[in-house]
Structure formats: structure tokens, C-alpha cells
């Protein structure tokens, strides 16, 4: 069938002739198309009856017109998409060419430097005379030749500091004033966040990023200036003074405070000058630096309990792209006064990788996130009907509330009770601002049940356990550390009416996904704890408890990433302004070392998957798989209480946090690679023979019972059998032959289906993954499995450890026999499984 012409005025018939439509008919059809792009046959006949102007057109012609119109719309969208991709590739190519030019200059500079120059030349001020490596955007920018110009607090003096800051920043952003090296673990490519680099051998710590974002330069500048919206550690930025400049820019004096990430370190503050200007090529620049007394500029008195840190010339170079969007260069360069913290925490303040993750890349991610939301049609609604901006606001409130609890600033109403030297610190807050937000929803006749907020917090050092692994375990196995009665008590503070706990009860946990960022480095979800509480208006029917939960840092391969699990009880109404009392965990890596064995395994089979025949890891990419040798975990729990119960709740909270610490230490020990290796008793680096033997038993037993091979490509080598079994597309899971069978092994597909890890697998029993029908079927088939040796199960539904339903086409269960023909375990294979 031939297509119509582009103007939409021709329709085609089966005999090859075209029908010409009048402009009025085309206009009417276009209106109908916008209302219903794909009408049914009945709807098309109805359209002809409703529009007299279309009465002389046959229904088949109308059908063809709509087909052609949809085709043109699809072609238009595809052409628009290809144009956007082409613009993006052009901009990225330009960015890469500039980066290549900068690297060539850096190489040239390094080649011409000799050892005498390095040893005898005093370290010059950063970029004042970097004319040999002038960047592509500094043409027309006059570098300051004076080493110590006379300045004061006058507008002229501040402008002099601002111009010097601009020159220094540009030489870092696109020049060679700082020796940049690629961020470990970052793989450049069209799908990467951008080009990320960290400093090597400079004063303080520095990080640099450049990338393409789909926002106009002015919008980009507006976002990056609003630092608290994307930098989670930023407590406040106060603009103390604004001075316009002759070139249309502005000079601002800022006072900025940062939260301390842990209870073991004091918070930081900065006294800054920020300069916003437009370069000759149209680029927009926002640059900043600390103001010091040596500059004779305005000063800011030191603030009690804060450590005054220094920001060296940093900022954002924002250049417009042809066809829309911007290319942005980001530089963060700070001296965080690492000497003011305990020695064990100093890597946190001396690592450029940490600075890159929490500051530089956070800004770039925020820009890309907002750009994606802008491009979505009508700012599409997602996450339980919430728009992206509303969900971002909720995540910011969770993070900010947790930071407030960890820091406990006195100017926010927090005060320490009891012994401040105790392992668990107890603080209370009865300020009106805190309570007003807490009791926001008490408008249904119930009196507010809380007039004090109590926080129990502590920090602990962890050895040899990756933060991402530990945090994933805490998320997936809440029952290992949480007390359900405490969960119900926490929820009572934010319910629309009083709610009490069901003592001794344990409900199910269901995780409901809510939203995630572009790169999935952070996601928000709702935890539904079923039947943990009840309310006085209906004391018989159990109430569900909902927790709003924020997770980040779950990527094991990310370098310098802080892992967080922050949650807060939330009312079922889930209002945007719902009161939140955040609690949770923060795990910060302190240093990294190459892992000698992977912690992501069980006590038997997984060891061999991670250890090769020469004692090295099977994976060839070892650069990203480094485990954190040390990390610091901070725990904070907030309780809404009545003032007369303060001492009682403080004692309870202290014991609760101590219990959590004990649970975390136990879990961390179990996840530690050294502990696993000692328990397994590895005598050689060749992998566990038990693992390879079990894989062989599984395949031999399947072949003996079913008469066919389990694996498509079988090999005589045990190691090949093991790897093929591990990478099999169907879920293969083994369980013990006990009164209450528990899982002992699963291949990668099995772990994905159960949404668990190899370490946590043994906490899941067989009956937990089946619904009622599945359990009945299993009970009826179990005797056949034991007598006949195998059974074929019909397709059905099972549940992951997260409570998500999983459908499977069919399943096979069989006994796994050892060398003596004795039953070792039962193995299941779930064929063609998928999440419902």
C-alpha cells in the first residue's frame, strides 16, 4: 500500500489511485487525530457520521489517512531524535578535542620539566603566569602579573580579587595549572556522566568534571549557585553582600556551612567570594574562592564548633552549545583542614576521589537529572503520582533531617543529655521549629503525642567490609537488626492519630519502588511493614506501617562513594509536606586496597567463582573491584516522645542503638572476606573443591533423572561446569534437606530472581518464596521428589526476598546425589522467569 504525500492531502486506495482531500477535510482529520491517533473501525465510522465534511470519504480511506499520519509523526519524532543525538555528538566531539588539546599541552609541559626545576624552583602561585598553557577560553583574559597586589574591602579591591580568581579558575578548568589524572573506575564513553579527573600532588584536594547538559547556561548557573539543593552536606549558604560590576557581572560575599558527615568530626564553614561574569566568547563563569586576612579584604569571625576550611579558586565554566544545551567545566579545589580530625578519619578529608563523588559529580548529576525531567513530556508524573521536583524535595528532606540529627547543632535547639563521653550520644530538641514540622498532620481531633525529639547516635569503625555490600544487607534483611516494636513506636510520632505496637508480632516487609536518579546511584522507595501496629479506633485490625527510605552508594565498583540508608516513618496519606523524623546509617570508606578474595559469596560454591586456578580473581577487570579496608559507620535514630518519658526513652534508645551496633558488627564479620576464607578453610588458592564437586553433582543428577543435559555446553573440567552453571540463564537454586529447607546456593540468575546476595541467601527458607498455591503444589509434589527423584512443576508465581512477585513458565526439582548415591540436597530450576 502506497504512502500519502507529506502534506497529508492525498490518500491511497487499493487500486493505486489517490484521493485528494480538501484543506477543510485535512483540518478536520488533524483535529480528530490529536484526540484519537489510532481510532478503531467503529470509531472511524462514528467520526464520519459526526463530521459531515467527511461524509464523502470511505472508511477505508480514513483508515489509510490515519496510518499515514501516524507514520509521518513517527518519522518526525525520529528525525528530531536523530538531530538531537547529532547535536550532542557534535558537542561531545568539541569537548573531547579541547580535552585532547589540554592533555597535549600538559604532556608538553611535563616533557620540558627537568629534575633540577622540580627540586630547586620554589612552588609558584597557582596560575598567575600560565601563559604557555593558555586555555581555549582565556583569550582576551589578562592574567595578573603582580604577585602581591594591594587590595582592600572596597569594590575595586574585591573586583581585583575576583579577576584573579577567574584567571586561576580558568587555568585549572581548561589549562594545566593542576595535574589532573583520570578518576579511578570512571570509564569514558557516550553514556558516561562526563570526563572526571582528580588532582595529583597539589595543595589540598581537587576534582574536575566536564560534560554536556541539556539546559541553557543561565539555568545551569542558577542551579549550581543553589548549592544546598544538590550538595547534601551543605547546611546553608548566606549571601552577605552583592556588588555589581561594570561588565554586567556580580561579586558576592558568601558564608557557607557544611554538615559533618560523622559524629567523630566537626563541621566546616567557608568565607567566600563568588564572581559571576560573561567572557568575550559568550561563556558564563561562576567562580569562587575563600577570602583570607592576608588579602586585606572583608573578614568573617570564626564560628564556634566550626572549622574554617579554605576553598581555592573553583567554579563553573558554562558554554552554550549550538542547537541548545551547555558544555560545563566544573572545578572543586579545597583545603579541608584534615589535621583537625582524628588521624583515622583524615583520608576522608585528604582524598580527591571523595571530593569528586560528593561535590563535583553531584553537581553534574543534578544538572543531568533536571535536564532529563525538562525533556520529558509535560514533566511526566511518576512515583505514586509525584512529580520529579516533589520527589527530589522529599529526598532532600530525608538527607537534611539525618544530617541535622548527626550534627545536633545548638542553634537548632539540640542539647546533649547524660554523659557526652558515652559510646551512644543522646541529644534532645524541643524547639518549636522542630516540633511544628513533626506535628504538622495532627488536625483530626487527636492531641499531639510528641513534644520532644530525642536522637540516639553513634559512630563505629569497620574493618575489611565494603560499604555497598553491608548496606545492601541492612536494606534487604531489616529483621536482622530492627526491632518491630521500635518501628511501631517511631511510626506513632507521625500518624494522624495515636498508634501502639503489637508486642511480639512480626509482619511481612514489602519494598515498593518509588523513584531513582538517572544513573541509579540513588533511589527512593517505600517500605511497607505489614500488621505491626493498631490504632485505638480499631484495636483488632492490624495497621500497616510505611517507611519512606532513601538509598545511595549501592554500587560496589564506585570509588570514594558514601553509602547511605536513611528512612523515616510516613503516614499512609504520603503528603508532600508530611512530617519526617529520619533515622538510618551512613558508611564512609576511609581507604581502599585490592581485595584478595571477593566477599560477595557463600561459604562454599561462590568461592570458586571468584578465585581462578592461579589464585587470582576470575575477572580481568580488577581496577574497579577494590574493597574498602576501613570505613566509618554513623548511626542515628530519632524518636518523637513526650517530655515526661525522656529518661525512659533515652535508656531504651541507647540500648537499641547498642543492639544495632552489635548486629552490624556480627554482619560485618560474616561479610568479611578473611572471615569467610577462615570458615571455609581454604588450603590452596585453587578454589574450593566442594564448589566444583557440587556443580558436577547437580549436572550429573539432572542428566540421570531427566535424560538430558542441564547445561548446553558441558565440559569435562569441573571449573568449566561451575562457570557454565553460574551463568545459566534460568534460575538454579539448591536447598537443604531439612524439616525447614533453607537455600544453600543459587546461580546468578537465581540471586537476581530472589533479589538477594550469596551471603544472605542462607537466611531464606524454601517456603517463604512460594505463595499459598505454590506451597500446596510443593507439598503435594515433595513425596514424588523424594521417591522418584524428580518432579516437574507447572508454571506459577513465587516471591523474591523483597516480596516482589515472580512468574515462571515451569520448574523442575530433583535430588542432587553425591558420589555414594546419597541425597545431598534438592535443586530447583525456574525456567523463563520474570518479575510481574
Swiss-Prot record:
SMART domains, per this entry? HOX, START
- Relate the outcome reported for changing residue 189 to D: In icu4-1 and icu4-2; gain of function. Delayed in juvenile-to-adult and flowering phase change and increased number of vegetative leaves, which lack abaxial trichomes
SUPFAM superfamilies noted in UniProt: Bet v1-like, Homeodomain-like
Q: Which UniProt keywords are present, listed alphabetically? A: Coiled coil, Differentiation, DNA-binding, Homeobox, Nucleus, Transcription, Transcription regulation
DNA-binding positions: 14-77
Name the Gene Ontology biological process terms.
cell differentiation
Protein's UniProt keywords contain Transport: no
Every copy of the START domain together lies at 151-379
Coiled-coil spans in chain: 72-115
CDD domains assigned: bZIP, homeodomain, START_ArGLABRA2_like
Kindly list the places in or outside the cell where this protein is found, as annotated in its UniProt entry. Answer: Nucleus
What GO terms are given for molecular function? DNA binding; DNA-binding transcription factor activity; lipid binding
**Entry comment describing in which tissues the protein is expressed:** Highly expressed the developing vascular elements and the adaxial portion of cotyledons. Expressed in developing ovules, stamens and carpels. Expressed in procambium and shoot meristem.
| InterPro entries hit by this protein | HD, HD-Zip_III, Homeodomain-like_sf, MEKHLA, START-like_dom_sf, START_lipid-bd_dom
Subunit info here reads: Interacts with ESR1 and ESR2. Interacts with ZPR3.
Homology family: Belongs to the HD-ZIP homeobox family. Class III subfamily.
Physiological role: Probable transcription factor involved in the regulation of meristem development to promote lateral organ formation. May regulates procambial and vascular tissue formation or maintenance, and vascular development in inflorescence stems.
Question: What name is this protein filed under?
Answer: Homeobox-leucine zipper protein ATHB-15
Instruction: Please give the organism.
Output: Arabidopsis thaliana
